[in-house]
Amino acid sequence: MEKEKSICFSLKRVNHIVERGIHTSLAAAGFDEITNMHGWILGFLYHAQRPVYQKDIESNFGIARSTVTNILQLMEKKGYLTRTTDEHDARFKRLELTELGKKVHLDTIAVIDSAHDNMEAVITYEERRICFEVLEKICKNVEKITGGE
């Protein structure tokens, strides 16, 4: 008898396939140099309601300081963001999107939204609702078991 499929394995597989599909869509639209993390950081900065510093990126995404430094240096070199000295504390550098960074964010989001729409076109509203309900149930259970948030 065949062993029952693992939900965790299926989630990992779907995640990999979706990320690969989005990367392919982005590359076809000319955004092949945008990494997933660059995209997340662009979005974080774009939607920020307050000044953002490197420490915010480190804590929000759970990334080491040295890694964030390298990512931000590359993003600054590509012209997506600037680091300016905070007017209240010269030790801190405020991160701000450039006009290019804003444009890249909006353009990549349009490509990603279109890719999501195409991927989800095969499921009904009810299937989508049930999927979210089941995933949320699994998340809450894992958090309960592991003591996570």
Positions of the model-derived regions?
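C-terminal regulatory/oligomerization modules of transcriptional regulators
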Residues: 1, 125-149
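N-terminal leader segment of winged-helix/HTH proteins
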Residues: 1-32
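Short alpha-helical elements of helix-turn-helix
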Residues: 8-9, 33-43, 66
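Pre-recognition alpha-helix immediately N-terminal to the DNA-recognition helix
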Residues: 21, 40-43, 103, 130
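Charged, amphipathic alpha-helical coiled-coil/dimerization segments
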Residues: 73-133
